[in-house]
Amino acid sequence: MAPAADMTSLPLGVKVEDSAFGKPAGGGAGQAPSAAAATAAAMGADEEGAKPKVSPSLLPFSVEALMADHRKPGAKESALAPSEGAQAAGGPAQPLGVPPGSLGAPDAPSSPRPLGHFSVGGLLKLPEDALVKAESPEKPERTPWMQSPRFSPPPARRLSPPACTLRKHKTNRKPRTPFTTAQLLALERKFRQKQYLSIAERAEFSSSLSLTETQVKIWFQNRRAKAKRLQEAELEKLKMAAKPMLPPAAFGLSFPLGGPAAVAAAAGASLYGASGPFQRAALPVAPVGLYTAHVGYSMYHLT
């Protein structure tokens, strides 16, 4: 029972070197080493007890603190008590085992960060009215082709036809003189007799027609311009009639002497041979050009 008594006399946590199985054969010689081991173990236990024991709940990065939703009220008060005492003494102090800057960080509410318009949080925070309003077709920034369900092109703008610009006359322009039928016949008869009137003749003729000299003068000027245009048109027509008609060779059609009949005879000779028994002599045919009249000449006389 001696080994059992030695084990109970040692304090808790001391490693026992001597046991019932490892005790040396000599009983008296083994008593001194066991007493020295007991004193060394007691001193180690005192040193460990002198060290401050930190509860794992005070550490913010411990497993218990990470798994728990919030700290215990007691732990919070015990962690804040040393810091309040240190502030009252005049110097900043932190609780033992807590890293600097981590005190009160989990409990202090973090300042809300501004959410962007295109971030996930910003889109989730937007109300439904804002989303519906953004998608509504009444938004002025949207183009007409985006409002259409089929993305049809915008309708073409109807451009009003340009206004017809009329020729602007002078403001002091005199109105056109309405000549009567008798006056026109008398003016035309006088123009055939003489195209240019002298000053005396124009004064006498205008008084007989109850017209002014300026009206008679302008009418004769216009009538001479009209006669000149008609004369130029007649000359152009005579020039066109005097030009000879182009011969058929100009159009790529050339006939040999004898006309189309000679062409047919030559084709038959080449087909049957020159010495064929059924060959017939072709009658001479007068050229077609001898019987054709000049087209321009006939047109000139018809006009």
Curated annotation (Swiss-Prot):
Residues 18-56, 69-120, 133-163 are annotated as: Disordered. Residues 133-142 have a biased composition (Basic and acidic residues). Pfam families: Homeodomain. Sumoylated by PIAS1, desumoylated by SENP1. Sumoylation of Lys-15 and Lys-133 not required for interaction with H1-5, transcriptional repression, inhibition of myoblast differentiation, or binding to gene promoters. It is found in: Nucleus. Residues 172-231 bind DNA. Its main location: nucleus. Residues 31-44, 81-101 have a biased composition (Low complexity). There is a cross-link at residues 15, 133 (Glycyl lysine isopeptide (Lys-Gly) (interchain with G-Cter in SUMO)). GO terms for biological process: activation of meiosis; anterior/posterior pattern specification; BMP signaling pathway; bone morphogenesis; cartilage morphogenesis; cell morphogenesis; cell surface receptor signaling pathway involved in heart development; embryonic forelimb morphogenesis. It comes from the Eukaryota. Belongs to the Msh homeobox family. Acts as a transcriptional repressor. Capable of transcription autoinactivation. Binds to the consensus sequence 5'-C/GTAAT-3' in downstream activin regulatory elements (DARE) in the gene promoter, thereby repressing the transcription of CGA/alpha-GSU and GNRHR. Represses transcription of myoblast differentiation factors. Binds to core enhancer regions in target gene promoters of myoblast differentiation factors with binding specificity facilitated by interaction with PIAS1. PANTHER family: HOMEOBOX PROTEIN MSX (PTHR24338), HOMEOBOX PROTEIN MSX-1 (PTHR24338:SF8). Interacts with CREBBP/CBP, TBP and SP1; interaction with these transcription activators may inhibit autoinactivation. Interacts (via C-terminus) with PIAS1 (via N-terminus); the interaction is required for the localization of both proteins to the nuclear periphery and specific binding of MSX1 to the core enhancer region in target gene promoters. Interacts with H1-5. This is Homeobox protein MSX-1.
